[in-house]
A protein has these predicted regions:
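Conserved AMP-binding A3 loop
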Residues: 16-43, 50-52
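AMP-binding/adenylate-forming
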Residues: 33-40, 56-112
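Active-site glycine-centered loops adjacent to acidic/histidine catalytic or metal-binding residues
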Residues: 106, 133, 156, 210, ...
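AMP-binding/adenylate-forming catalytic core of the ANL superfamily
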Residues: 209-297
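Conserved pre-ATP/AMP-binding loop-to-beta segment of ANL
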Residues: 3-20, 53-56
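Gly/Ser/Thr-rich phosphate-binding loop
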Residues: 116-172
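AMP-binding/adenylate-forming core of the ANL superfamily
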Residues: 185-213, 223-224, 278
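AMP-binding/adenylate-forming catalytic domain of the ANL superfamily
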Residues: 294-316
Length: 322
């Protein structure tokens, strides 16, 4: 979808607009969402970051998904001067680009940009950079820490019309815990999954598939949260519950080749964890796992795959990985 096509849809008489989920947990699903709630979401983000009319913004993500659409809506809501570039893994490659007040990228775009000195300099001139659409790896987090500008990780999904919480990745306010926006209530259900009550962007409370931990900020009294992993990424293996994201986080500093953990039905164990990797040295991978992971976290199988399956937005596509 082009920006002109989106704007034509935005300015028509229909109070709703069609969006699609990213497909990280299955086939992308269409959703009809209210334009007024998208404007509410845009206003909340712009207020949080202190964006003002005339500030500059960069659109470098596809308009097929909510993240790209919301960048346009924020520019409309706050009268930002929006520059569009073709979505790519190097969004700041053009040396003629101006400095920006605000931009949103996925982790892969930030990682690739920071690897190129000239592009890194341009990224450092973005006053507020928000990163969403995937996990922040340990390596990327370390690359972000020394940056002088404000860099944030977002939490949200298509159903919440982009993000409902941010956490700072660098500077004195850096944290592992997300701070919800004003007007957003959070709680846990009986399964330990995050429940979001954000009436300005969602008509009903939303029960997520994200297993979370809550705590109260001593300074502000706000309830903060940390995501441990997805409920559907729990492997129930021989009576032991294994959170896939926690296994991957533990292994990431030790494995240089791309990898992911998936699960598969097993007659004896119920389910078993399998490590997929682009490396061909499976013996070495298994040795690292046995030396690094708790005994019951060690995958039961190790398989080579030429290219790990990813969604269009760069998230692991675990469903149907075989």
């Amino acid at each position: 979808m082009t920006k002109d096509e989106f704007l034509a849809e935005w300015h028509n008489d229909n109070p709703r607009i069609l969006v699609h989920t990213s497909g990280s947990t299955g086939k992308p699903k269409p959703l009809m969402v209210e334009k007024r709630r998208m404007l509410n979401s845009a206003r909340i983000t712009c207020d949080f970051l202190g964006l003002k009319p005339g500030d500059t913004a960069l659109l470098c993500m596809p308009l097929d998904y909510i993240a790209g659409k919301m960048m346009v809506v924020r520019s409309l809501q706050r009268d930002l001067r929006l520059t569009s570039v073709r979505p790519s893994s190097h969004p700041l490659a053009d040396e003629t680009l101006p400095s920006f007040t605000f931009a949103a990228m996925v982790p892969m775009q930030v990682y690739n940009t920071l690897k190129v000195p000239q592009e890194r300099e341009r990224l450092m001139r973005i006053r507020h950079l928000i990163i969403g659409g995937g996990a922040i790896s340990d390596e990327l987090a370390q690359m972000i820490k020394p940056l002088p500008n404000a860099v944030w990780s977002t939490y949200g999904m298509t159903e919440t019309l982009s993000h409902i919480a941010l956490r700072r990745l660098n500077g004195p306010d850096a944290s592992l815990w997300y701070t919800p926006f004003d007007g957003v209530g959070i709680s846990l259900n009986a399964d330990g999954c995050l429940v979001i009550d954000a009436p300005e962007v969602c008509a009903e409370p939303l029960v997520t598939n994200d297993i979370a931990q809550l705590r109260t900020d001593d300074r502000t009294g706000k309830t903060l949260f940390r995501i441990k992993g997805r409920k559907d990424n729990v492997v129930c293996s021989g009576g032991i519950k294994i959170q896939i994201e926690e296994v991957e986080e533990t292994l990431r500093p030790h494995l240089s080749e791309p990898f992911m953990i998936v699960k598969k039905q097993d007659e004896m164990l119920g389910e078993k964890a399998i490590l997929l990797t682009e490396s061909t040295d499976l013996t070495h991978i298994e040795e690292i796992c046995r030396n690094t992971l708790p005994k019951y976290w060690v995958p039961r199988e190790f398989l080579h795959i030429d290219h790990l399956p990813l969604t269009e937005t760069g998230k692991p596509k675990r469903s149907g990985a075989f």
